[in-house]
């Protein structure tokens, strides 16, 4: 996005967004209609996350070429590792949903303009599409429209970050730093079952891309979720990027373009190592036929020839590639001698495992010699992770979870800038109602390195994990129908 070609494409992007905002809402390429594709069909917290968004980006890029008049347009990516802030062209231009008069200003106008055309679209859905909506929790139009109204943001609140405050928050800067990105690219399998030991590149296997999230990989749970929430805001009133109408903020496509680029980096790393780049043969029977039924072509017609997840495992007919960015360096060292993963270690969760603000739920892990050995190795040879599973309250909006590691018997410093901080996670899509246990994976290399440096990581001796809800981004505690429950912590290496 900062290169000369990126700047040229950014201007074409502005032209395309301008054109989409001017299209009538009866046109499927209208800016808001395009956002509804995401609301009605996007997967999060499962193994279809990467391929679905590749299809969504690919058709959007083709639409931008058509409407901008630039047949050579390529969607720029926002390399937030190199530039952990919203860059100036995203403010004070058509790419700024807060300050441009081209955007719908408030909920009343949104309903006046969009409800009727979306109802007409709903009435045109095929039985297969309606089945997908029912799986998603939209048995009728009223359920969809209720979620749409909840996911829209009035213009003054449409984006949390501003030209005066453009930087990603500190937790998000950690989530996008090069160490986290390298950790996200290190796994060598495409996807695992939710409860399986070890680590995969994608979020876990799920029964459908329409159901609630089952777990988050490092890539999805750290840079993806964190950037969404840092840009959109962690507390009410939420901005667009914090909701499932997030594509209404033009930052969305620059953000997701970088996620897709990192998937391409991982794929090329796997190829360099002679390893598989997709689901296993056994997994393909479930993965490949998953229906993607809501994409739109550049001419405004529904996509009818590529309606399966398997169609988007490769870049294929979209025919693009990426200029090098952060993370590219994992490919030359991909064949360096990495240590074999250690057997997964299970922490014992305390009987009282409610996660509250500054009141941690805890778990105790007895350190193995294998963990000490791999933690002492450089990151090029081994990385360590913690998979934290929680049973969340029905509404996860505004909940920012922090994880700390300390020696047994010590009181952890519950400060994200302190010596015991290991990592953090939060949900994206605050209007999702999460009821089942969800896992989040965080890299813990740095936390274990600090324990080693202090002589506090020893085989046979316990370490304590503490999980709390952060003060920042919290809701009023009285508004929580129930606290989150810590259910499991697994530690391993990759």
UniProtKB/Swiss-Prot annotation:
Keywords: Copper, Melanin biosynthesis, Metal-binding, Monooxygenase, Oxidoreductase, Plasmid
InterPro entries: Di-copper_centre_dom_sf, Tyrosinase/Hemocyanin, Tyrosinase_Cu-bd
Molecular function, one GO term: metal ion binding
Binding annotation for Cu cation A: 38, 53, 64
Protein EC: 1.14.18.1
Signal peptide per UniProt: none
Keyword Metal-binding included in the entry's annotation: yes
Keyword Ribonucleoprotein: no
Catalysis performed (reactions): 2 L-dopa + O2 = 2 L-dopaquinone + 2 H2O; L-tyrosine + O2 = L-dopaquinone + H2O
Cofactor note as given: Binds 2 copper ions per subunit.
Gene Ontology biological process terms in this record: melanin biosynthetic process
SUPFAM superfamilies: Di-copper centre-containing domain
Family annotation (Gene3D superfamilies): Di-copper center containing domain from catechol oxidase
Enzyme class, first EC level, given as a word: oxidoreductase
Binding-site positions, Cu cation B: 224, 228, 256
Top-level taxon in the UniProt lineage: Bacteria
Transmembrane parts of this sequence: none
Cofactor(s) the record lists: Cu(2+)
Family, per entry: Belongs to the tyrosinase family.
Listed name of the protein: Tyrosinase
Origin species: Rhizobium meliloti
């Amino acid at each position: 996005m900062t290169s000369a070609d990126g700047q040229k494409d950014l201007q074409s992007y502005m032209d395309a967004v301008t054109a989409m905002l001017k299209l009538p809402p009866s046109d499927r390429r209208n800016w808001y209609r395009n956002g509804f594709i995401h609301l009605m069909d996007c997967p999060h917290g499962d193994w279809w996350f990467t391929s679905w968004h590749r299809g969504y980006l690919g058709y959007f890029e083709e639409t931008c070429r058509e409407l901008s008049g630039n047949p050579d347009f390529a969607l720029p990516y926002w390399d937030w590792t190199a530039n952990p802030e919203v860059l100036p062209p995203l403010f004070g231009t058509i790419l700024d949903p807060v300050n441009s008069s081209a955007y719908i200003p408030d909920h009343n106008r949104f309903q006046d303009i969009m409800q009727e055309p979306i109802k007409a679209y709903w009435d045109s859905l095929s039985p297969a599409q309606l089945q997908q909506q029912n799986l998603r929790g939209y048995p009728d139009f009223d359920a969809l429209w209720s979620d749409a109204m909840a996911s829209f943001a009035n213009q003054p609140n449409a984006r949390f970050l501003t030209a005066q405050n453009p930087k990603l928050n500190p937790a998000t800067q950690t989530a996008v730093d090069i160490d986290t990105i390298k950790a996200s690219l290190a796994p060598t399998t495409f996807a695992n079952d939710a409860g399986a030991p070890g680590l995969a590149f994608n979020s876990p296997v799920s029964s459908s891309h329409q159901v609630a999230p089952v777990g988050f990989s490092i890539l999805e749970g750290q840079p993806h979720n964190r950037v969404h929430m840092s840009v959109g805001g962690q507390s009410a009133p939420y901005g667009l990027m914090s909701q499932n109408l997030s594509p209404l903020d033009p930052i969305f496509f620059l953000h997701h373009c970088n996620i897709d680029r990192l998937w391409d980096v991982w794929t090329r790393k796997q190829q360099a190592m002679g390893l598989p780049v997709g689901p296993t043969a056994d997994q393909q029977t479930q993965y490949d036929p998953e229906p993607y039924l809501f994409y739109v072509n550049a001419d405004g017609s529904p996509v009818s020839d590529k309606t399966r997840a398997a169609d988007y495992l490769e870049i294929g007919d979209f025919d693009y590639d990426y200029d090098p960015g952060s993370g590219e360096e994992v490919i030359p060292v991909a064949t360096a001698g990495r240590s074999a993963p250690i057997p997964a270690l299970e922490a014992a969760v305390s009987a009282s495992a409610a996660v509250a603000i500054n009141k941690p739920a805890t778990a105790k892990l007895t350190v193995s010699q294998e963990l000490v050995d791999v933690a002492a190795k450089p990151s090029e040879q081994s990385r360590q992770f913690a998979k934290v599973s929680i049973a969340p309250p029905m509404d996860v909006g505004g909940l920012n979870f922090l994880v700390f590691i300390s020696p047994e018997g010590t009181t952890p410093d519950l400060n994200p800038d302190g010596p015991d901080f290991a990592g953090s996670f939060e949900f994206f899509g605050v209007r999702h109602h999460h009821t089942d246990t969800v896992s989040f994976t965080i890299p813990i290399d740095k936390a274990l390195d600090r324990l080693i440096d202090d002589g506090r990581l020893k085989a046979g001796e316990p370490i304590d994990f503490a999980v709390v809800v952060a003060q920042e981004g919290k809701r009023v505690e009285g508004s929580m129908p129930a606290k989150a429950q810590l259910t499991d912590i697994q530690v391993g290496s990759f």
